[in-house]
A protein has these predicted regions:
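Residues forming the flavin
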Residues: 3-53, 58-166, 170-537
């Protein structure tokens, strides 16, 4: 195949215009037959309000008289080159017989893709998820948003699909993976029901509503491949002798002990009771830096006009944004989990704690844009340096946040936040939320240095996106679960200091988001496959 980069066309272009551009760049005869596939599509707004789509495409020539090499040479362009697609290959099995099925604790993206890879290699994993299957979980979450009644086991954080199920389903990642794992993740999502556009969109997203359906299809496939799913069940203990795993224990009344030589800890970033258990069991762990802040809402129309340079009269998706700033005090302030056309959601998972997140459906059709504007925190902010210090810091913020809103999402306009004043009414636009809200002061939740950094960050972002620091921008408190506050150490073989236990994904400190967690799950599965061969009785 031939790859063409940097095909630039107006956003209103037709399919025929793209074909003509391919013919022109390859200097083909108009009668030459060819097929093409989009590899990458991104919006170029650098000359706004003139907007363009930029494409990379793979072209297959049907005319065998002209070799691809000859066509590339004739094109005489650095944007035209020979293309060979990287196909992901599961590694060959190792030599050590594994006669007890591997256990995966957690059915988020890391756990699911670890299970998917293991199942494809014949390992028939047992997946144990503390939360409910996604069908029941969706009902539990909706009930919580409507009534405030929290199910500590089945909520926005816990349950099949992981915390990312109730976000935007964003799939972009900064992970560079030449082995084809990133492509495998996207193709697998499409295989189980996601829109094929995620394969080439520069900012791919599935949407909460579609992602739930994809997860069900993926689970059913894995069951057909020999995997077992155990829901509403938490791994609460490990049997370890001489630094070697012998079995896992769960809080189930039936068959609470599962003998195994391999356990993948695909924990979410909110599995605090499991972190405690692992710490007390002697796992090598360390606290790490993360970030906290507030979910900030603006009118989506304002963001579109700023990013696109026009009032959105032509068909364009709701615009995302990404903003970042660093200050002399060493703090970074940046946007996180930006949700175009989204909702602020109550994503609490513990009684008497309040935490928020952002969410979008596939069509991203709410009137507001939101993102977390967060401030970096490091172990020095925790006042301690043990592995669980960051967890305790999160809990402190979340319990105080709960008190501010009396269990509801506390909100304050940015202007009132700057003036340390209670908000009494929204400004020119209202909030789009899932979960009940109340006006409350958010001042003092972060320390003075962090709060000042947040204000300066908002002001700086106002120079980048007109209106970002408007006084009626809506702040919702607090966003504390941006990433895991700790890391469970592992060696080059992906094992912890306990033989047979493999820390994996976001909760273990090795990923940040759906795609990177899924890739890490695949990597851990590969390590297991390379070491063992299935030999189940």
């Amino acid at each position: 195949m031939i790859k063409i980069n940097q095909i630039k066309l107006p956003v209103t272009h037709s399919d025929e215009a793209l074909k003509k551009k391919i013919i022109k760049m390859l200097k083909l005869n108009a009668k030459t037959g060819f097929t093409y596939r989009i590899l990458k599509k991104s919006l170029d707004a650098r000359k706004k309000p003139e907007l363009f789509y930029t494409y990379s495409v793979a072209v297959e020539i049907e005319d065998t008289k002209n070799s691809e090499e000859a066509i590339v040479k004739r094109a005489a362009s650095s944007s035209v080159l020979i293309y060979k697609e990287k196909e992901y290959m599961i590694p060959a099995c190792g030599h050590i017989p594994l006669d007890r099925r591997p256990v995966i604790a957690g059915a988020g993206p890391a756990g699911l893709f670890c299970a998917y890879t293991l199942a494809e290699a014949g390992f028939r994993p047992i997946v144990i998820e503390r939360g409910s299957r996604v069908e029941k979980r969706t009902d539990d979450v909706q009930k919580f948003w409507e009534s405030g009644i929290l199910n500590p086991k089945s909520n926005v954080q816990f349950g099949e699909g992981g915390a990312g199920t109730f976000s935007d389903g964003k799939l972009n990642t900064s992970v560079k993976d030449p082995s084809g794992r990133n492509r495998l993740v996207l193709e697998t999502f499409v295989r189980f029901g996601a829109d094929p556009s995620i394969l080439y969109d520069n900012k791919p997203h599935i949407g909460t509503d579609v992602l739930s359906e994809v997860i069900v299809n993926m689970r059913e496939f894995l069951v057909d491949k020999g995997a077992t799913f155990i829901f509403d069940t938490c791994v609460n203990n490990l049997d370890i002798v001489s630094q070697k795993l012998l079995s896992v224990y769960t809080d189930s009344d039936n068959n609470s002990q599962i003998k195994t030589d391999v356990c993948v800890l695909a924990l979410g970033h909110s599995a605090r009771d499991t972190f405690d258990m692992l710490y007390n069991k002697g796992f090598d762990m360390e606290c790490k830096s993360f970030a906290v802040g507030f979910r900030v809402e603006h009118p989506q129309r304002m963001i579109d006009e700023s990013q696109y340079g026009i009032q959105k009269k032509i068909i364009l998706p709701p615009s995302p944004y990404k903003v970042t700033s660093n200050f002399p005090n060493g703090r970074g302030v940046y946007s996180f989990c930006m949700c175009p056309g989204g909702y602020v959601v109550n994503s609490s998972s513990t009684e008497n704690h309040t935490v928020v997140n952002g969410m979008s459906y596939h069509d991203r059709n709410s009137k507001n844009a939101n993102s977390a504007i967060i401030v970096s925190v490091s172990p020095k902010d925790f006042g301690a340096d043990d592995a669980l210090a960051g967890v305790r810091y999160q809990e402190k913020l979340e319990t105080e946040n709960y008190k501010r809103g009396n269990g509801l999402i506390p909100q304050q306009l940015f202007g009132d936040f700057c003036d340390d004043r209670l908000t009494t009414a929204y400004g020119d636009f209202g909030s789009c939320t899932k979960g009940n809200t109340v006006f409350a002061k958010l001042n003092g939740l972060m320390n003075a240095d962090m709060e000042q950094s947040f204000k300066l960050g908002m002001e700086h972002f106002g120079h980048l996106i007109h209106g970002f620091d408007r006084k009626d921008a809506i702040l919702s408190g607090m966003e504390t679960r941006t990433s895991s506050p700790l890391r469970i150490k592992r060696d080059e073989s992906f094992e912890s200091n306990i033989s047979g236990v493999y820390p994996c994904g976001e909760g273990a400190g090795y990923a940040g988001g759906i795609t990177s967690a899924a890739i890490d799950g695949i990597k851990v599965a590969e390590a297991i496959i390379k070491k063992y061969r299935p030999d189940f009785k």
